[in-house]
Amino acid sequence: MKKTLLSLCLLLSLLPMRLLATTEVYVVAVGVNTYKGEPGMSLNFCRQDAMKFASMMLTQTTHVTTLYDEQATRRAVYDKLKQVCSLADADDVVIFYYSGHGMPSGFCCHDIVYTQTGLTYTDMQSLFKGCKAKNKMVYADSCYSGKLRPSGRRSGSAGKKSPVMFFLSSRSNETSIEMKEKQNGVFTYYLVKGLSGAADSNHDKFITAKEIFHYVSYQVKQASRQRQHPVMWGKFADDMIVACLN
């Protein structure tokens, strides 16, 4: 239990080097503004979203891989996640972040062809099932991302089949809003702000799944005037630590 707690604390705190020898945090951050052969699908700030998330994580770990635009083909994203999952040990943390277009079963990669060649929920479940890391998290800022959630699951720590915490930017029938003034998606802006400390509602230097959900959900709903509602689901406790602050 102690080693698991320390593993999670690595997410956003600078821990002594002796811990880094046995605990690692692996991050794959993907941002797609442009889509091959689909100029009408272009977005504005998805690359910036992924850069913002990756920049935050780079202050805590060197194991951060970024894939932007034409780099983020379906094969490249899948292979990188597969590599990360194979490297992670039981006490490690694996984080996948995505910003871009969503599709009913997953996320659109750069080489998307209508609803094909995306990274699907089935792909992620298959990869994570073979991953030794006990703590796996998916953050996604994409339209209709709530469709990734199996039907009947509630927001919060719902579901008993997924070993992964999914935190998605919107419900299945909602778009995910970009903020021109911040040059970020509204979800990513408040996600990074929350993980950096703003979500620590009881000021105990630990941010739990429940705290990050409530903080981001409230801020996104306010900023979007109730047009966007983040969802969270997976097999985890409400008090699971997702960030530890100095």
Write out the residue ranges for each language-model feature.
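Cysteine endopeptidase catalytic domains of the caspase/legumain-like
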Residues: 3, 10, 15-246
